[in-house]
Regions:
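Inter-heme linker and motif-flanking segments adjacent to c-type heme-binding CXXCH motifs
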Residues: 18, 37-43, 68, 154
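Gly/Gly-Pro-rich "capping" loops immediately C-terminal to redox-active cysteine motifs
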Residues: 40-65, 76-125
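C-terminal capping alpha-helices of c-type cytochrome domains
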Residues: 1-9, 64, 87-89, 94-99, ...
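The canonical Cys-X-X-Cys-His
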Residues: 23, 27-37, 47, 147-151
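Electrostatic cytochrome c docking/interface patches
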Residues: 1-26, 43-45, 54-61, 81-86, ...
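Small-residue transmembrane helix packing/gating motifs
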Residues: 124-132
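Active-site phosphate-binding and catalytic loops of NTP-dependent enzymes
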Residues: 69-74
Length: 154
C-alpha cells in the first residue's frame, strides 16, 4: 500500500457528493481481495450487489471500520506458524480428528494444512478483518465516498 492518509469521520465522508465513475477506478484497491462483477479475487465478500440494500453512511462505515462488523463466513481469520514460516487467511474447514484444516489464502487459493505436525501453531484472530483501513491504503475522504457511491449503484 501507499503512504497512509488522515481521514475524516464517517458522517463527514458520507455527506460528500459521490462520483460512481471515480469510485469504480478507486475500487481497484478493493479487487485485490473482493470480486466486483467479473473483476477481482474471491478472498473477501462478493461486493457486486452488496451496497444496493445499504445506505451511503452504512457503506462508508463498513469501509472505514473493517473490524467493526465481520461478514458471515469471513469471521474466522487465522494465522499459522511453523518456525519462521507464516500462513494467514480465512479458516474454511477444520477437523480436529483428522488433524487438518483448510485455509483460504490471499488470492483465493485454498490449502489443506496438517496442524498436528510438530511445531505448527494455529492462532485464531478474534474480531480481526484482513481488510486494511482506507487510510492505510492511502485513500482520501473523496475516494471512500466515491467507492461508496459506486457500490451503492452497481
Amino acid at each position: 500500500f501507499g503512504p497512509g492518509s488522515v481521514l475524516s469521520d464517517v458522517k463527514t465522508i458520507a455527506a460528500l457528493k459521490g462520483n460512481a465513475a471515480n469510485g469504480k477506478t478507486a475500487a481497484a484497491h478493493c479487487t485485490i481481495c473482493h470480486k466486483i462483477g467479473a473483476a477481482g479475487v474471491s478472498f473477501g465478500p462478493q461486493l457486486t450487489n452488496w451496497g444496493q440494500a445499504r445506505s451511503i453512511e452504512e457503506i462508508v462505515k463498513e469501509i472505514m471500520e473493517p473490524n467493526a462488523k465481520l461478514a458471515h463466513g469471513f469471521d474466522k481469520p487465522v494465522r499459522l506458524r511453523k518456525g519462521t514460516n507464516i500462513a494467514e487467511g480465512m479458516l474454511s474447514n477444520f477437523s480436529w480428528h483428522a488433524g487438518s484444516l483448510k485455509i483460504k489464502l490471499f488470492g483465493g487459493e485454498v490449502k489443506k494444512i496438517l496442524f498436528r505436525r510438530k511445531g505448527v501453531k494455529v492462532e485464531e484472530l478474534k474480531n480481526h478483518s484482513w481488510m486494511p483501513t482506507p487510510s492505510r491504503m492511502g485513500l482520501s475522504n473523496q475516494d471512500v465516498r466515491d467507492i461508496a457511491e459506486y457500490l451503492k449503484n452497481l
